[in-house]
């Protein structure tokens, strides 16, 4: 077992671990060891579906010392007129550049990819039999939120009937094999699934959107790296929110002021997952008329009829026993 020594032992090389390390390198003379189970920095972005993008402008993401993206405004697509949204490949490449061109050349960072942390300063390689023991001053667990994308776990429900369950990573390769698509969840991943299908000319009638309840959605036009956007957010969110006496009144006032969006104007959302869309994307989402609400229970079981279905599950999926 190799013996190592450092000031900070950072577990995880995702956005949090990288941002923390960046600040320590900039504002102190500390030495750090980073341990991560992935083969390169980027955390769960390494496991994400190929067509995923940030839901926020690239300028808001990454580490303090290096800008992500080119700070450009999109001129085409559903994000037209707003600041660019980094792709999956761009995010992973960005974090890899930060590691290879900034962290490691500093001489103060040791990086151990493809390693599993066991706790108490011990970790081992996932590719060899090498084991390590670290003596450290402070341990920083940047994996505390335990983000697990659908491709790294089984669906949280059982299926019966002629049904295929697949994470979004497989969606682009499914082709015309299925008569119908059921998208499960009401968060960012589910929105991405629906928009991907519509963008690829799947008839809205071939899509069912299964969700626990409706969700409040942020307007991306009001989350931009500009002074105008800050002013709009103050007027549409902060001011009406500060005047609210309870949660229901908060969402009602902010929505009336234009600070929040909803898919169905006739249904009052009861969930908030911080999902972000443009109004052009919202128009597309409203094309889905088959929205099915389900009850949440501990022992899920789903039955569909004889037509072949494809089941896409996102991180917002919740297990359920029947549809209502």
Language-model regions, residue ranges each:
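Conserved small/polar residues in nucleotide/adenosyl-binding loops
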Residues: 321-324
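Feature captures the FAD/FMN-dependent oxidoreductase FAD-binding
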Residues: 77-148, 284-287, 298-305
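Beta1/beta-strand and adjacent pyrophosphate-binding region of the FAD-binding site
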Residues: 4-16, 179-184
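Internal nucleotide-binding/catalytic subdomain
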Residues: 249-274, 280-283, 289-295
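Glycine-rich FAD pyrophosphate-binding loop
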Residues: 26-47, 209-215
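Glycine-rich active-site loop/strand segments that organize a redox cofactor
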Residues: 43-93, 214-264
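N-terminal Rossmann-like FAD-binding beta1-loop-alpha1 element of flavoenzymes
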Residues: 8-30, 193-197
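Glycine-rich dinucleotide-binding loop and its adjacent helix/turn
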Residues: 81, 87-94, 141-201, 207
């Amino acid at each position: 077992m190799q013996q190592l020594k450092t000031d900070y032992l950072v577990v995880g090389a995702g956005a949090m671990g990288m941002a923390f390390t960046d600040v320590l390198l900039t504002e102190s003379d500390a030495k750090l060891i980073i341990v991560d189970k992935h083969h390169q920095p980027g955390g769960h972005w390494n496991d994400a579906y190929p067509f995923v993008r940030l839901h926020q402008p690239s300028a808001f993401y990454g580490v303090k010392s290096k800008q992500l993206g080119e700070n450009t405004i999109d001129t085409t697509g559903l994000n037209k007129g707003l600041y660019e949204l980094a792709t999956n490949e761009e995010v992973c490449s960005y974090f890899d550049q930060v590691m290879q061109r900034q962290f490691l050349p500093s001489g103060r960072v040791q990086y151990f990819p493809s390693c599993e942390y066991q706790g108490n300063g011990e970790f081992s390689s996932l590719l060899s039999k090498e084991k390590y023991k670290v003596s450290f001053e402070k341990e920083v667990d940047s994996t505390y939120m335990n983000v697990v994308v659908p491709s790294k776990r089984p669906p949280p429900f059982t299926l019966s009937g002629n049904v295929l369950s697949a994470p979004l990573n497989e969606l682009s390769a499914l082709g015309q094999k299925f008569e119908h698509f059921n998208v499960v969840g009401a968060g960012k991943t589910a929105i991405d699934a629906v928009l991907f299908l519509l963008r690829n000319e799947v008839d809205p009638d071939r899509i069912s959107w299964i969700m626990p309840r409706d969700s409040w959605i942020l307007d991306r036009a009001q989350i931009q790296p500009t002074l105008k956007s800050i002013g709009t957010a103050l007027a549409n969110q902060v001011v009406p929110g500060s005047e609210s006496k309870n949660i229901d009144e908060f969402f009602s006032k902010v929505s009336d002021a234009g600070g929040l969006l909803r898919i169905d104007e006739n249904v009052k959302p009861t969930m908030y997952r911080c999902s972000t869309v443009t109004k052009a994307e919202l128009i597309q989402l409203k094309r889905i008329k088959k929205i099915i609400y389900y009850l949440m229970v501990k022992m899920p079981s789903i039955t569909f009829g004889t037509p072949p279905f494809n089941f896409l599950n996102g991180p917002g999926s919740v297990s359920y026993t029947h549809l209502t």
